Amino acid sequence: MVKNMANVIQTNNMETKIPQTKNEAFAQLDAMLSEKEKSELAKSDTIEYHFSLGMWIRNNWIYGQEEVDVKRLAKAFRMEILFFEADELSEKIIEYYQRYLKRIGL
């Protein structure tokens, strides 16, 4: 089941800044998602977010961005990008964000 995240779709037209660190990425996601969405994400399989949150991450933080910025983002999530793979990076960001949500008790 693909998770529909209304807030993600609403923010697609927002101007976003590609995060340079995990903390910046988490702060943007925290501001964008509702408490209910964060709670559901913390308990779900991350693959369920590939076509919602994952697509938003790819469209706003990866595709069309400067290579140096995307590499910095990948490095923040402990990924070395030799051959660019946007799906893997967006999945890794969601996995780390899910761990963060679990640590803060959601």
Protein language model features and the residues they cover:
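Compact alpha-helical subdomains of small soluble proteins
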Residues: 35-106
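N-terminal export/targeting and maturation segments
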Residues: 2-41
